[in-house]
Amino acid sequence: MDVADLRREYTRGGLHRADLPAEPLALFEKWLAQACEAKLTDPTAMVVGTVDADGQPWQRTVLLKHYDAEGMVFYTNMGSRKAHQLEGNPRISLLFPWHTLDRQVHVTGRVEKMSTFEVMKYFHSRPKDSQIAAWVSQQSTRISARGVLEAKFLELKQKFANGEVPLPSFWGGFRVRIDTVEFWQGGEHRLHDRFYYTREGEGWHIERLAP
């Protein structure tokens, strides 16, 4: 398949320096709300980038579960590839690809582990089947067939039918302490708007970048 001529124009309007808030999370929250209003599929989906011990980058899609002035939060199996990589190198990249709105947001920072209390509170807010699934999957390990997972799920669903699903010891979360945020808005003639927030002490420095 020849993909060289697959392209389109970006015509949704620009992003102007005068309209930017002092804090990047204020603009992120506005854009996220607009992504939800536009009924984008999985508006909280973000591409999480990590690096392994050999310097090889890895990416996968994870759902954002909370954000505030302290950072952005996601949960995962702590035995997973990404968790092991973050243990060795806490630097992380997050990308929110809101293509339908001609937008993307790129976040960089460092992770710290969530407390057991925070993890447990979120874990027990999940649908029960999702809690059971956390026990079933030893994420990133090799399995012989999907049937192995399905059989284990049915076994545990019966086991926990009449009681609470306990928090797995291998399940946890990370908070991303944000260092930089870049907002990208597609523009006509490929003259896109890019604004880059860098943390400086208690505030933020904002720069416009060439597209």
From Swiss-Prot:
FMN binds at residues 60-65, 75-76, 81-82, 104, 139-140, 184, 194. Signal peptide: none annotated. Its EC number is 1.4.3.5. It catalyses: pyridoxamine 5'-phosphate + O2 + H2O = pyridoxal 5'-phosphate + H2O2 + NH4(+); pyridoxine 5'-phosphate + O2 = pyridoxal 5'-phosphate + H2O2. Gene3D superfamilies: Electron Transport, Fmn-binding Protein, Chain A. Substrate binds at R7, R8, E9, Y10, K65, Y122, R126, S130, R190, L191, H192. It holds the Pfam family PNPOx_N. Pathway: Cofactor metabolism; pyridoxal 5'-phosphate salvage; pyridoxal 5'-phosphate from pyridoxamine 5'-phosphate: step 1/1; Cofactor metabolism; pyridoxal 5'-phosphate salvage; pyridoxal 5'-phosphate from pyridoxine 5'-phosphate: step 1/1. Keywords: Flavoprotein, FMN, Oxidoreductase, Pyridoxine biosynthesis. InterPro entries: Pyridox_Oxase (IPR000659), Pyridox_Oxase_CS (IPR019740), Pyridox_Oxase_N (IPR011576), Pyridoxamine_oxidase_dimer_C (IPR019576), Split_barrel_FMN-bd (IPR012349). GO terms for molecular function: FMN binding; pyridoxamine phosphate oxidase activity. Its cofactor is FMN. Catalyzes the oxidation of either pyridoxine 5'-phosphate (PNP) or pyridoxamine 5'-phosphate (PMP) into pyridoxal 5'-phosphate (PLP). Homodimer. PANTHER family: PYRIDOXINE-5'-PHOSPHATE OXIDASE, PYRIDOXINE-5-PHOSPHATE OXIDASE. Belongs to the pyridoxamine 5'-phosphate oxidase family. This is Pyridoxine/pyridoxamine 5'-phosphate oxidase. It comes from Aeromonas hydrophila subsp. hydrophila (strain ATCC 7966 / DSM 30187 / BCRC 13018 / CCUG 14551 / JCM 1027 / KCTC 2358 / NCIMB 9240 / NCTC 8049).
